[in-house]
Amino acid sequence: MEAPCSPPTAGKFVVVGGGIAGVTCAEQLAINFPSEDILLITASPVIKAVTNFKQVSKVLEEFDVEEQPSTMLENRFPNIKVIESGVKQLKSKEHCVLTEDGNQHIYKKLCLCAGAKPKLICEGNPYVLGIRDTDSAQEFQKQLTKAKRIMIIGNGGIALELVYEIEGCEVIWVIKDKAIGNTFFDAGAAEFLTSKLIDEKPEAKIAQKRTRYTTEGRKKETQARASAGNVGSALGPDWHEGLDLKGTKEFSHKIHIETMCEVKKIYLQEEFRISEKKSLTFPRDHHDQSVTTDKEIWPVYVELTNEKIYGCDFIVSATGVTPNTEPFLCGNNFDVGEDGGLKVDDHMHTSLPDIYAAGDICTAAWHPSPVWQQMRLWTQARQMGWYAAKCMAAASVGESIDMDFSFELFAHVTKFFNYKVVLLGKYNAQGLGSNHELLLRCTKGQEYIKAVLQNGRMMGAVLIGETDLEETFENLILNQMNLSAYGEDLLDPNIDIEDYFD
């Protein structure tokens, strides 16, 4: 027999998730409805707040993500009440959320922002570490201090940043694509960045972008939750700031990339000994193809689909994320996308009445602008959380609103290998078929510029380095001006194209 529940709490608006999408949504609702209690349900004692927000251009934005105790959010917005508990069940027909602490929370409008969890290449293996939230990033730092060699599996943003930031440790990087950073770059941009990996890294300027709060009193509880598979909110931009990512050896970069392969099998030390297979030493030279058997004994061994086997201290699984829908699906008839996310329409509404979703948990199921696509990035989490709050507010007072302008054009600014990286529109010619052309300009070690054109109109761009072209290119994509007359002059470094299009 279940323990009797406490009397239900009621909030006109309830938000689930303490990550960027959830906190942004709750803050916006609190501003719109200062006399209403906004309930924010989160499994973590800390929340992720957007700070130093800067609108760089019409759609490009920059911000930091700061981890804060939830009390700071409640102090800023007295009408936000944070409930620190995981969700046990959603009863959509009763408009009720049951939390793991045994309480019930009644809502009129609900927004699900529970994020995503890392796809692990192997569940339950102590030598496989997924990096998704601050707890797992700090666990990674701890493991790295004892490591001589690690293997990184994956080719997304976290893998790219890790490979560049790690020092004093051999890194074997396994990617299933031909070139690095396939989510973000074509082979040309990948080549431009790869050269940076070979160079010695300059001493980084110590620029602490945000405060990290440790919650000592909760450490055991947090570890218990983490091992139970609980999900922390996603890492924000510059997540590795403040982490000392150094291994045991005295050198900067030692990276070997194994392309076009995946993990075939993982062996623990004893299993590998019994198998009588041979592992390889760390390749010393990209041009030297000679194979040497590794005499060193490692805690874990990885066999790749290209038949190579390497030993290492531990494996980092950075192979993407899965929307964290599990607590909400049972007993509720949500429409779910192919990627496992809750489908939302152009007002962030799910298929169930009064339930919205934003951030990594959702799948954009509307007909998108020709130069926008969903990617599970922190910029989109902020935009979706903000817009979902606007939609919930409008619906609750019977108003209709237009879709937010941020969904007109995909725009993301980040840093990889210490270069500023701006991605605009269909930057990798996604979905354009063969009917497109590329204009390229590259100055080794300085900048890489790619414009994607279709029928003379710019559809996307990649800008690496301090190019100062983001606003001009953003305008050219948005206004769809025919650029055929300019030809390759568009990227001529001797022509100031900003003067053309002011």
From Swiss-Prot:
Biased composition (Basic and acidic residues): 213-223
Record localization: Nucleus; Cytoplasm; Cytoplasm, Myofibril, Sarcomere
Start and end residues of each stretch annotated as Disordered: 208-231
Keywords: Acetylation, Cytoplasm, FAD, Flavoprotein, NADP, Nucleus, Oxidoreductase
Co-factor(s): FAD
Principal cellular location given in the protein's record: nucleus
Enzyme class: oxidoreductase
Superkingdom: Eukaryota
Signal peptide range in chain numbering: none
InterPro entries named in the record: FAD-bd_OxRdtase, FAD/NAD-bd_sf, FAD/NAD-binding_dom, FAD/NAD-linked_Rdtase_dimer_sf, NAD(P)-bd_dom_sf, Rubredoxin_C
BP GO terms, sorted: cellular response to oxidative stress
Listed EC numbers: 1.8.1.-
Cofactor note: Binds 1 FAD per subunit.
Residues the record lists as N-acetylmethionine modifications: M1
GO molecular function, one term: oxidoreductase activity
Record's function text: Probable FAD-dependent oxidoreductase; involved in the cellular oxidative stress response. Required for normal sarcomere structure and muscle fiber integrity.
PANTHER family: PYRIDINE NUCLEOTIDE-DISULFIDE OXIDOREDUCTASE DOMAIN-CONTAINING (PTHR43429), PYRIDINE NUCLEOTIDE-DISULFIDE OXIDOREDUCTASE DOMAIN-CONTAINING PROTEIN 1 (PTHR43429:SF2)
Family affiliation: Belongs to the class-I pyridine nucleotide-disulfide oxidoreductase family. PYROXD1 subfamily.
Record protein name field: Pyridine nucleotide-disulfide oxidoreductase domain-containing protein 1
